[in-house]
Amino acid sequence: MNKRDAQNISDKIVAVLKEERIKKGISQYKLAKDTGMSKSSILYIENGKQHPTLYTIILISKYLNVEIGSIISSIDNMWQ
């Protein structure tokens, strides 16, 4: 695995989390406010201008009530 592969995985994780946020009708503003993040951070992460840390991924996934394992499984299925 190289740096580009890691970035692709990060992009896919963000895509899953963004899809869940939208599906649940949660705005970027509400997500930012409720998680203590800035709206610009959420915007940059979702637009691929910033890669989230593991802490940020866990924080957002817990807020959205999305299991990390299910995210990894969906990415693993995409990867094959």
Feature-to-residue mapping (PLM):
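DNA major-groove recognition helix of helix-turn-helix/homeodomain DNA-binding modules
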Residues: 55-70
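Conserved hydrophobic/aromatic packing and binding residues within compact polymer-binding modules
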Residues: 17, 31-32, 42-45, 71
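Short, charged recognition helix plus adjacent turn
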Residues: 1-8, 70-80
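A short, Lys/Arg-rich alpha-helix, primarily the initiator
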Residues: 1-23
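Recognition helix of helix-turn-helix/homeodomain-like DNA-binding domains
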Residues: 36-51
